[in-house]
Structure formats: structure tokens, C-alpha cells
Amino acid sequence: MSEVERALDVLLQEAEELCIGSSVVELDRIPTALEFCREFYSKNQPVVIRKALNWPAIGKWTPKYLIEALGDRSVDVAITPNGYADGLATQNGQEYFVLPLETKMKLSEVVRRLDDPTGAVHYIQKQNSNLSVDLPELAADLRVSDLDFAQQSFNKPPDAVNFWLGDERAVTSMHKDPYENVYCVISGHKDFVLIPPHQLSCVPRGIYPTGVYKTSDSGQFYIEPLRDEEGSDQFTEWVSVDPLSPDLAKYPEYARAKPLKVRVHAGDILYLPNYWFHHVSQSHKCIAVNFWYDLDYDSRYCYYRMLEQMTSARSG
């Protein structure tokens, strides 16, 4: 065992003993800003707040209501053959990191497509503050003051407020984000698999050529490689393992990961701290809204960057 591997091993052991439990903490009430900051934000620990939201959106945002109120509204939609927007797929023996086919559609048409289990998978998941940009009328059904505990702790407004709508085939493959994520489920449920940042060395990652889904004249999906202005292939680092069915023979390091699993129901809030790996699946026609807050680039970020370099040095 190298000195780097020994140091990473110490980190895994001590973090397991001191920091992370075997399940995500659950609360039955919204915490004060002080409680949230002290117990979760400052410790980079996730928490689920059960039945926290008494918003008009809960119960109101049905597919029928969305069609009647905003059915003619044009929205960005991600389309894939398998439900994995921003994920790995293979074509002609080559594995790619693949972006979805993105297009504009009427909201009513998206909802209709969700009831076709044999067709392509349509998912409203544009992470550009699409609720504010495409569906601003829906903001009136959110009582964002319920999230003051988070905003006061982060001491900043959200960078983006995103609207999510898809069927049970839509999956978000495992990844991490440089954001504090306050995730609110409006209808249905979301299933999260979470891995803390200190387990970075347990999560296998690879560098993959980047592609995007396209459709042929016959409607068949294919992957078109992305290239830069000089014609060179583009590449993306991405998590190699599927946490729902990990190939431990191929990725033995993942055996040391200790994923946390949690189901977030309608009316629940999940606080997902920055740089936590997460994989997300969902129920049919699940609707959610999440609030992204940029992370503070403080000493914790510096330590995480050091961990990235140590993990790379071990692999290299």
C-alpha cells in the first residue's frame, strides 16, 4: 500500500467513525436557521424534513392542471431512448458520456408523451432556472419563505430554481454538483442514492468521449460525437459505476463505498450538500422543484480539491 493509499484509508476509517451514520437524518419539522447551520450545513450533512411543505403547489400541480393552465407554454425538454440524460451509453463498442437530445415542446405535449411507455423518454430537467424562465406563473404556488432556514444559512439567494417533470423511466445517473441543493418534491416520490465526498476514492470515474443523442430520418436514436472547433473529440469525466447494480469485479474499489438511500415524498425537503454524489430515480409523473445555491469556496473546498488530487495520484 502506497503512502497516498494509506492516507486515503485513514480518511475513510475516521470519517466513518466520526461523521457519517448509516442513514440520512430525518426531521419532522422545519429547523431554525441556527439549527440547520449548526447540525447540517456546517457539517456538510444531508437531511430530510418530512411533510415540511404546505404549499399550494402540493395537490394543485397535477398533469391536468398543468395542461389547463400552461399547456401551450413552450418548455425545454430532454429526450433519450433509455431515460438517462447526461449518462453513459455504448455505440459500436465505444462507451460515451451522452447528452440528451434537447428541443422545445408544448407542456401539454410533454405530459401526453409521459403516458407512452413504449416511446422515447421525455424529461423536463433543464437546469437553467427553468421555473423562473419558462414557467414563472408557478412561482406563486411556492411559499419560499419556508426555506428561509437555508437561505439565511447560505447568506445568498438561489442561483437557480429548477422545475422537474418526468416518468418513472427518467433517471439521473450518479454525479456531484458544486451547489447546495434544497430539493422539494411536489408530487410522487424521488429515490436518492447518496455517497459523501470523503468517499471519493471509492467512486470509480473515467474519461469518456462526449456525444449527444440525435435521431435519424426513421426516428432511431444514435450518438453523435461532439468535437471542438478544431475537430478534436471532446471528453467528459463521469462516474463509471451504476450504484443500483455495481460491477464489483470491474470496479472493486466501489465495495468500500457506503451509499445512503432515502425516498423523498411529496411535501418533503431534502438538503443535499455540495459535492455529495447522488443518483436519482422517481415515480411516474413525479414533479419537483429544487433550489441551487452556489457553494462557498472556503477551506472545505480546498480540502476537497486536495482529496481529488490524492485520488488521482493513487489512480495514476
From Swiss-Prot:
Keyword Metal-binding set for record: yes
GO biological process, one term: circadian behavior
Keywords: Cytoplasm, Disulfide bond, Hydrolase, Iron, Metal-binding, Nucleus, Oxidation, Oxidoreductase
Molecular function via GO: 2-oxoglutarate-dependent dioxygenase activity; endopeptidase activity; ferrous iron binding; identical protein binding; peptidyl-lysine 3-dioxygenase activity
Binding site for succinate: 123, 183, 190
Modified sites of kind Cysteine sulfenic acid (-SOH): 19
Localization (cell): Nucleus; Cytoplasm
Main location (coarse class): nucleus
Disruption phenotype: Viable. Adults possess disrupted circadian rhythms displaying reduced daytime sleep. Adults show decreased tolerance buildup following repeated ethanol exposure.
Cofactor(s) in the UniProt record: Fe(2+)
Entry binding sites for Fe cation: 175, 177, 278
InterPro entries, alphabetized: Cupin_8 (IPR041667), JmjC_dom (IPR003347), RmlC-like_jellyroll (IPR014710)
GO annotation, cellular component aspect: cytoplasm; nucleus
Its EC number(s): 1.14.11.63, 3.4.-.-
Subunit composition and interactions: Homodimer; disulfide-linked.
Protein name: Bifunctional peptidase and (3S)-lysyl hydroxylase JMJD7
UniProt source species: Drosophila melanogaster (Fruit fly)
